[in-house]
From Swiss-Prot:
Pfam families: Peptidase_M3, Peptidase_M3_N. The keyword Ion transport does not apply. This is Oligoendopeptidase F homolog. Zn(2+) binds at H387, H391, H394. Its EC number is 3.4.24.-. GO terms for biological process: peptide metabolic process; proteolysis. One of its GO terms (molecular function) is metal ion binding. Keywords: Hydrolase, Metal-binding, Metalloprotease, Protease, Zinc. The gene is pepF. Belongs to the peptidase M3 family. Hydrolyzes peptides containing between 7 and 17 amino acids with a rather wide specificity. It comes from the Bacteria.
């Protein structure tokens, strides 16, 4: 039973007074920054390129205000997340979001104005004013986007239209989370319960096939019923992506999305090529699942139930000890920051009524790299802890070693830091496993994670690319078109006939990531790169571990592929993917041998 917020032990809550001591301090800062933005609006547009000094002054002021806006937003959103029922912090978050929008509108002049400068004048100013070199990579990235930046007036119009462009995804979110009431279903205790998005995954992990089947059919009956509405929101969202790409003179929505993070399209293509080549491994794993479960007619609702009965329990204190022990492999510097996270209350540990579900790592440049958890004492919670700690260590190292302008990192790099930790935890637990049953459970856990992250997210990425291409070619994305396409791709990946699994054709309708604009492929590349890097960290040299820390410290001071190359990964080559699939095959082979021994019985 979840507690009220005030019943949680203080040491298990995050300390947000390290951001602002009081709410009044936050409110005063909000008022001050609003005034500062109003002043900027009156004084700075039209003057960016008056001189080298003007370029430096206006740039530094913009970055300083951005830094303060981020800090305000982080406090408001985290206060809201700890108890979403509190109207005060809902209002704070709305005000902070509005401030972000205002910041975007006020500084809409910056990029179009900057891009009026010639490379010759820019290089001359760089030679004259040493401090401009601090921002050279930022300016270089702007020059790289020059062909895609519009006039100041057009940029301001686009910024103002931001809320309209967000409406398809917001409509989906409200409809899917607030308006839709899912059916009642039976749980393992034969009790009728309300099916929710939150409890669906646990029902799909049930050992009782009847429970799984009923929950699965109940969920997808909803998506079948409202398929035309979901198709319309997704179609409109795809049109927004394609329109924005066209407005900015990109060849496609995918090119626009990847160029925004300076990721070459080749990375996406190399991933898809490797995935298609290794689909027989997934088919082999599905066949093994059939054998272990003793089901000849395996269905999509049989994919998620764990194959092991072993019940790992970790209380939080044990989880902390294990995380510290596992992550000590990175050396003294990393170990010290992990210790600080646990001792200085960076982590909000327990579930409470009204608290946001799930887990994340957050914070801003000027704050601790906070983490939100909802600890339930499972093996997954331990993996979540080291995962979020990976993000937080990435943030802490970046902020300590980079100025604000380069003090963040793209999602493309973020998922590598978190899942490297998960892979090292798996390696450690496998090494420590006492018997075949433990080993069987851990191998199953890792193989399922790989399937769910590398194969499944690539399946989503393939569907996402195809629907954007179809819309651009004039195809109408009706529910019939989307159902047919999704069913076909799902069959290709899982080798389970679409006609035997009719409900799965509606799965596209429930995936929020299809509204994120070519985002999901990064989960697959991230997990594969992390698998490759974890092997280097665990089995490699001190130099390999040092190179990994260099990647964590680099932030966005170079292009993403240059940053991850510091750790030893070439994302345009299939090498890291081949190594990841090789490990998948080795662990799958080991699981097959354990099954031959009857360990699963």
């Amino acid at each position: 039973m979840a507690k009220n917020r005030n019943e949680i032990t203080e040491k298990l809550t995050w300390d947000l007074t390290t951001i602002y001591k009081t709410d009044k301090e936050w409110e005063a800062e909000l008022t001050r920054i609003k005034s500062e933005l109003s002043l900027v609006e009156e004084t700075d547009p039209g003057h960016l390129l008056d001189s080298a000094e003007s370029l430096l002054t206006i740039t530094e002021k913009m970055l300083s205000i951005s830094q303060q806006v981020e800090k305000l937003y982080v406090y408001a959103s985290m206060k809201n997340d700890q108890d979403t029922r509190e109207a005060k912090y809902q209002e704070y978050q709305s005000k902070a979001t509005a401030l972000y929008v205002k910041f975007g509108e006020v500084y809409a002049f910056y990029e179009p104005e900057f891009l009026k400068i010639s490379k010759e004048v820019y290089n001359k100013w760089l030679g004259e004013l040493q401090k401009l070199k601090n921002y050279d990579h930022m300016f270089e990235r702007l020059f790289a986007k020059k062909a895609h930046i519009l006039s100041q007036k057009e940029e301001k119009l686009l910024a103002a239209a931001g809320e309209i462009f967000e409406s398809p995804s917001e409509t989906f979110e409200i409809f899917d989370n607030a308006d839709i009431k899912l059916p009642m279903v039976k749980n393992e205790s034969d009790e009728m319960i309300q099916l929710t998005h939150g409890n669906y995954s646990s029902l799909m992990e049930s050992k009782n096939r009847g429970v799984r089947k009923a929950a699965y059919k109940a969920l997808y009956s909803n998506y079948e019923q409202y398929q035309h509405t979901y198709a319309k929101t997704l179609q409109t969202n795809v049109k927004v992506h394609n329109l924005k790409a066209q407005i900015r003179s990109y060849d496609s929505a995918r090119q626009a999305a990847l160029a925004n993070n300076f990721v070459p399209e080749k990375v996406y293509d190399v991933l898809m090529e490797a995935i298609h080549q290794h689909l027989p491994l997934l088919h082999r794993y599905i066949e093994l699942r059939k054998k272990i479960l003793g089901i000849t007619d395996l269905k999509m609702y049989d994919i998620y139930t764990p194959l092991s009965n072993l019940d790992y329990k970790f209380n939080y204190e044990d989880g902390v000890k294990k995380a510290e022990e596992v992550l000590a492999i990175f050396g003294k510097e990393y170990k010290g920051k992990v210790k600080a996270a646990f001792e200085q209350r960076w982590i909000d540990v327990e579930e409470n009524i009204g608290k946001r579900s799930g887990a994340y790592s957050g914070g801003s440049y000027d704050t601790n790299a906070f983490m939100l958890l909802n600890w339930q004492e499972t093996l997954d919670d331990l993996f979540t802890l080291v995962h979020e700690m990976g993000h937080s260590m990435h943030s802490a190292f970046t902020r300590e070693n980079q100025p604000y302008v380069y003090g963040d990192y793209p999602i493309f790099l973020a998922e590598i830091a978190s899942t490297t930790n998960e892979n090292i935890l798996t390696e450690t637990l496998l090494k420590e496993s006492k018997d075949d049953k433990e080993r069987f459970a851990l191998l199953n856990h890792w193989l399922d994670s790989f399937r769910g992250t590398v194969f499944r997210q690539s399946q989503f990425a393939e569907f996402e690319q195809k629907i954007h291409e179809a819309d651009a070619a004039g195809e109408v994305l009706t529910s019939e078109y989307l159902n047919s396409l999704y069913g076909e791709i799902n069959e290709k990946y899982y080798n389970l006939a679409a006609k035997e699994n009719p409900e799965i054709q509606y799965e596209w309708a429930r995936i929020p990531h299809f509204y994120y604009n070519f985002y999901v492929f990064q989960y697959a590349t991230g997990f594969a790169a992390a698998t490759f890097l974890a092997e280097k960290v665990v089995h490699g040299s001190t130099e390999d571990r040092q190179k990994y820390l260099e990647y964590l410290k680099a932030g966005s001071s170079a292009y993403p592929l240059e940053v991850i190359a510091k750790a030893g990964v070439d994302m345009e080559s299939t090498d890291y993917l081949d190594a990841a699939f090789e490990l998948f095959e080795n662990r799958l082979s080991e699981l097959e041998k354990l099954v031959e021994k009857g360990v699963h019985l």
